[in-house]
Amino acid sequence: MAASSRAQVLDLYRAMLRESKRFSAYNYRTYAVRRIRDAFRENKNVKDPVEIQTLVNKAKRDLGIIRRQCPLSSGIKSHAQGLQQRQHAVGPGCAVWKGCGMEEPSPKIMGHLNL
Amino acid sequence: MLLRAAWRRAAVAVTAAPGPKPAAPTRGLRLRVGDHAPQSAVPADTAAAPEAGPVLRPLYMDVQATTPLDPRVLDAMLPYLINYYGNPHSRTHAYGWESEAAMERARQQVASLIGADPREIIFTSGATESNNIAIKGVARFYRSRKKHLITTQTEHKCVLDSCRSLEAEGFQVTYLPVQKSGIIDLKELEAAIQPDTSLVSVMTVNNEIGVKQPIAEIGRICSSRKVYFHTDAAQAVGKIPLDVNDMKIDLMSISGHKIYGPKGVGAIYIRRRPRVRVEALQSGGGQERGMRSGTVPTPLVVGLGAACEVAQQEMEYDHKRISKLSERLIQNIMKSLPDVVMNGDPEHHYPGCINLSFAYVEGESLLMALKDVALSSGSACTSASLEPSYVLRAIGTDEDLAHSSIRFGVGRFTTEEEVDYTVEKCIQHVKRLREMSPLWEMVQDGIDLKSIKWTQH
């Protein structure tokens, strides 16, 4: 399998930033965006293809985490924190806890968790 | 009607697939106050969020009290809260095996953060339980030959309380004083060690003033005098590099919810070579090597393990960032306000915990004025009483300065905007409160407050 090309890494970077912006919690959102930018910037001069592949794999795993966690944090209603101007728009309503008055765990979430 | 609602929901889901365009985190910090509109659970309605929204919650600047869960930690915990719910001590079926595998993996993650062997990690319900096990367990095991313990005056309440309860059992405890900087005097420690001392307990990073004790030196002293060394590392684990072998630590307490893990879980490190014997506090089925019976809560320990792993990876990045933000906070406050004192040694100090005393301002009133920021004066466990913190008293702070101290916490998720906002509000309110203060007026007129003879009525 060929090592990840520059284009693939950039696609991954863009996808991660895009997904991170969907966190409704201000602190998680700002952390994710900042961390992703800093991590990709820090590793931009890595030349060893094995190391690049390791980093790309880790980034893919983290992208999966962000995809799973964003809807969870949006689905649970909570008042926005300090610096937000408006309650962040909610993604497709899938929450795990029935007690919060939300629907059944979405098959999308369960699929992601490989359950 | 139902059909239309369902169609609308589906339409939102489709258009929301690439991610709804979020309102970018704002630069202009307008805190809007609206009424508490009851939130309906239908997502379609909130896509067009009303301008008059709910009251915004305060900024969180109290990370020494507790920390939010890192999303990576929650992601690791969820499968064990949903489907993999087996008891890790069930030996006969797959539910038990997979739960046990997760527990052992978490143990390995915790151990590698502190340089220990996984067999030396025992899961508990938190650092308070770990401290109790360490102090009472060691003291009681060696009760026949050793009756003396040493600790400091700035320890966490659970350590001080455990020592007090041991005193009631007939043990002797020396509470070492600390210097003005908050650090103990190593010569005093050496002088306090007696032939019948079983344990020295000194916390690594203080939760109120952020002072770092010289753990490596204390470890060296204790191991040379053959005394066990316990450290409450709840505020230090995952934030500064710790190695139990380099620092000659025999027992260490770890707390889950201080390192972006779940609440209700912690761990205790108990050295095996040379073996530290501990009398178990909690009797039962012999789980956790007999030292802490009870079913190990798999989702919580998986969370603790994940938090430790994330902390290990992020330690350098977080430390650099937190140091920068902390510098920014202190510099900006101190250059705009006179008569601000930072409690604790500025050099041997963990940057994320900043304790400032604002002279001529009452701490509680400043806290209430800063209602948009979640802060604390002193530690959460003592915040209910009106007494000034015993830690500040131990470092020799004047009574009036002790009453006016505020603890700012900077953590992994704190942003520069939050720090700037906190600084701005703090300066504004301190100035306003000082304007109202007659003491401040007198100081401005050049009167030395210490020379005043207050009359009795």
Curated annotation (Swiss-Prot), chain B:
Signal peptide: none
Active-site feature positions: 381
One Gene Ontology CC term in the entry: mitochondrial [2Fe-2S] assembly complex
Free-text activity regulation comment from the record: Active only in complex with LYRM4.
Binding site for pyridoxal 5'-phosphate: 127-128, 235, 255, 257, 295
Amino-acid positions noted as binding [2Fe-2S] cluster in the UniProt annotation, renumbered to this chain: 381
Record PTM Cysteine persulfide, positions in chain: 381
Enzyme Commission no: 2.8.1.7
Cofactor: pyridoxal 5'-phosphate
Record Gene3D superfamilies: Aspartate Aminotransferase, domain 1 (3.90.1150.10), Type I PLP-dependent aspartate aminotransferase-like (Major domain) (3.40.640.10)
The record's account of how the chain is modified after translation: N-gluconoylated. Cysteine persulfide intermediate is reduced by thiol-containing molecules like glutathione and L-cysteine. Persulfide reduction is a rate-limiting step of cysteine desulfurase catalytic cycle.
Sites where the protein binds Zn(2+): 381
Keywords: Cytoplasm, Cytoskeleton, Iron, Iron-sulfur, Metal-binding, Mitochondrion, Molybdenum cofactor biosynthesis, Nucleus, Pyridoxal phosphate, Transferase, Transit peptide, Zinc
Annotated positions of the N6-(pyridoxal phosphate)lysine modification: 258
GO function terms (MF aspect): cysteine desulfurase activity; iron-sulfur cluster binding; metal ion binding; protein homodimerization activity; pyridoxal phosphate binding
Superkingdom, natural source: Eukaryota
UniProt record, GO biological process: [2Fe-2S] cluster assembly; [4Fe-4S] cluster assembly; Mo-molybdopterin cofactor biosynthetic process
Enzyme class: transferase
Listed PANTHER family: CYSTEINE DESULFURASE (PTHR11601:SF34), CYSTEINE DESULFURYLASE FAMILY MEMBER (PTHR11601)
Recorded family membership: Belongs to the class-V pyridoxal-phosphate-dependent aminotransferase family. NifS/IscS subfamily.
Protein name: Cysteine desulfurase
Gene giving rise to this polypeptide: NFS1
